[in-house]
Curated annotation (Swiss-Prot):
Keyword line: Cytoplasm, FAD, Flavoprotein, NAD, tRNA processing
Primary location class: cytoplasm
Family to which the UniProt record says this protein belongs: Belongs to the MnmG family.
Subunit-level organization: Homodimer. Heterotetramer of two MnmE and two MnmG subunits.
Binding site for FAD: G17, A18, G19, H20, S21, G22
PROSITE patterns per UniProt: GIDA_1 (PS01280), GIDA_2 (PS01281)
Domain of life: Bacteria
SUPFAM superfamilies named in the record: FAD/NAD(P)-binding domain
A cellular-component GO term for this protein: cytoplasm
Entry-linked HAMAP family: MnmG_GidA
Subcellular location: Cytoplasm
Full protein name: tRNA uridine 5-carboxymethylaminomethyl modification enzyme MnmG
Binding-site residues for NAD(+), renumbered to this chain: 278-292
Length: 637
């Protein structure tokens, strides 16, 4: 708030919170030349994975690839510390392929701490921020900590995770904490409220951890990693294969369900002590039993937390029920009849700022120089947090240098889709990225994230010469191979063509290009290699890149045409001083929603909940009338 302060140190940018969002933000700002301070409540928990120690999965893997393509860190971290890797949805098309890595949580945190502590231009310090220092024009000029130390800066990025007003619950017992064993951040929520920000409460939770030595694996279904290891990062320097560990699958039983149903009144939510919304797509086991009452069993995955850690993560079994009941629930699962519980499950509720209070740059609308990223914006997940942290970091640097900030269009990346959803939709539950949230998922694949975003990363300054040369070489090889496949023909009487017809039971009339062979259902690049028609000099990712571009070329072009058509109108900018409440042709709900969100473009306005196509049409007509009146007035002057 506005006071006179004796600042201890001065920085360009201060990042509050050193989770996955804060680390990406701080590394980006420091690497782009800004003197940065990263403040955290606990130096030993930098980039900690308090819930599932895993990176990736549907839509989340695309986010991770995109962060890496721009020059971020989370993809490299997952590749450096993986315990197991699997491709999910491999039987379906490439638009929904998803790489998932189980990671070593202690190793992950140790390596990330080492990276941030040794990054040029970045200083890391343990402290709790309780206040924002504003200048005469209500702009950010610094922060103040709980113990009264003030630091001067030009921009602040809040990446506070679940720590703002955090309270953890086990049954009807609660304590102030951002997560188990760590106190919550106090004071900052009150500061934000005084500044006019709306805050709300959200809830999440984490399952119990059990001792791996107490589990009977005899009848559990093994879930091994993939033989062929895939990578999140596009940087081959990080591609070092490691020994993989096995995960296991068990299921809930009628006994499990009865225990939960009989004791629902003891859970924080069903008991009425917590009314904050939890994540729809990562429900507690109580929610599953209630919402899917007709299901007699639910899958439960048993996953290692590290190579040298005895703890197992019981995925799909998060709960807020009392601790003594939790052990009975665990021991009702096959294989866990004699398990030892090392840490109880708990629910955590915390403050967040609905992200409609941010521009798509992630700078807040009320305070210049204040950015928000991660769970404070209402998201859930390390990958969503990392993506926002990177964007906030990039734009904080742009702000400090007085350069135009970057907005990521939703049709160019999952990052853009994520931020556009956050800034335009009135979300009241934790937001998780899903492939279904993108209208353009055929184009927004993991394999082409570098093609879509690395040129931007280079322009921003986060992609160095070595990475850029690797990128250019890969793209040149893919384009060259596509040309070869489109121009190389085999004739129906050639020996290789006769063999292909015999094996595939599909005729070749006259001749056919290798590209058209690839377009056939069930025919892949590995089949070309089987008939010595492939290019032995190419890397796997280059072969796959060429195959996907050719096999799906028709669909890709159709989607690109849709994007081009929409973008012609949707990028039309809206006046920042537009009084939506006075536009009588808009529905009342649209007036209220548009006035609250203050969208920057027609496209953004069209995606706000409660704004329908008729409202957009009315808005376009209104703008056209205003424009003509302006021209008429100007002509008469």
């Amino acid at each position: 708030m506005n006071q006179t302060f004796d600042f201890q140190d001065e920085y360009d940018i201060i990042v509050v919170g050193a989770g996955h969002s804060g680390c990406e933000a701080a590394l980006a700002t420091a690497r782009l030349g800004c003197h940065t301070l990263l403040l955290t409540l606990n130096l030993d928990k930098i980039a900690w994975q308090p819930c599932n120690p895993a990176v990736g999965g549907p839509a989340k893997s695309q986010l991770t690839h995109e962060v890496d393509a721009l020059g971020g860190e989370i993809g490299k971290m997952a590749d450096r510390t993986y315990l197991q890797k699997r491709i999910l949805n491999s039987s379906r098309g490439p638009a929904v392929w998803a790489l998932r890595a189980q990671t070593d949580k202690r190793e992950y945190a140790t390596i990330m701490r080492n990276i941030v502590e040794n990054q040029e231009n970045l200083r890391v310090r343990e402290s709790m921020v309780t206040d924002l220092v504003l200048g005469d024009n209500e702009e950010i000029i610094g922060v103040e900590t709980y113990f009264g130390v003030a630091f001067k800066c030009k921009a602040v990025i809040l990446t506070t995770g679940t720590f703002l007003g955090g309270v953890i619950w086990v049954g009807n017992k609660s304590m102030p904490a951002g997560r188990a064993g760590e106190f919550s951040a106090i004071g900052l929520s009150e500061t934000l409220n005084k500044l006019g920000f709306e805050t709300g409460r959200l809830k999440t939770g984490t399952p119990a951890r059990v001792d791996k030595r107490s589990v009977d694996y005899t009848d559990l279904e093994a879930q091994p990693g993939d033989e062929k290891v895939r990578w999140f990062t596009f940087d081959p320097e990080v591609w070092v294969e490691r020994e993989q560990m096995c995960c296991y699958l068990t299921r809930t039983t009628p006994e499990t369900h009865k225990l939960i149903r009989d004791n629902l009144h003891l859970s924080p939510v069903y008991g009425g002590w917590v009314d904050a919304k939890g994540p729809r797509y990562c429900p507690s086991i109580e929610d599953k039993i209630v919402r899917f009452a007709d299901k007699h069993s639910h899958q439960i995955f048993i996953e290692p937390e590290g190579r040298d850690i005895p703890e197992l993560y019981i995925q799909g079994f998060s709960t807020g029920l009392p601790e003594k009941l939790q052990l009975q629930m665990l021991q009702s699962l096959p294989g866990l009849e004699n398990c030892l519980m090392l840490r109880p499950a708990y629910a955590v509720e915390y403050d967040y700022l609905p992200a409609t209070q941010c521009y798509p740059t992630l700078m807040t609308k009320k305070i210049e120089g204040l950015f928000c990223a991660g769970q404070i914006n209402g998201t859930t997940g390390y990958e969503e947090a990392a993506a926002q942290g990177l964007v906030a970091g990039i734009n904080a640097v742009k702000f400090v240098k007085n350069e135009e900030m970057i907005i990521f269009p939703r049709e160019q990346s999952y990052i853009g889709t994520l931020i556009d959803d956050l800034c335009t939709k009135d979300l009241r539950e934790p937001y998780r990225m899903l492939t279904s949230r993108s209208e353009y998922r055929l184009i927004l694949r993991s394999d082409n994230a570098d093609q879509r975003l690395t040129p931007l990363g280079r322009e921003i300054g986060l992609i160095d010469d070595r990475r850029w040369e690797l990128f250019e070489s890969k793209q040149a090889n893919i384009n060259s191979e596509k040309s070869r496949l489109n121009s190389t023909r085999i004739k129906e009487l050639d020996e290789v063509a006769i063999n292909i017809v015999a094996d595939t039971h599909t005729k070749i009339k006259g001749s056919i290009t290798l590209a058209d062979l690839l377009r056939r259902p069930g025919f892949h690049y590995v089949d070309l290699e089987k008939y010595n028609l492939g290019n032995l000099d190419l890397k796997l990712v280059e072969k796959e890149g060429a195959e996907i571009d050719i096999k799906y070329s028709g669909y890709l072009q159709r989607q690109q045409n849709q994007i081009d058509q929409i973008s012609r109108q949707k990028n039309r900018r809206l006046p920042t001083n537009l009084d939506y409440l006075s536009i009588s042709t808009l529905s009342l709900e649209a007036r209220e929603k548009l006035s609250k969100v203050q969208p920057l473009t027609i496209g953004q306005a069209s995606r706000i909940g409660g704004v329908n196509p008729a409202d957009i049409n009315a808005l376009l007509v209104y703008l056209e009338v205003q424009y003509r009146q302006f021209q008429l007035t100007s002509a008469n002057v």
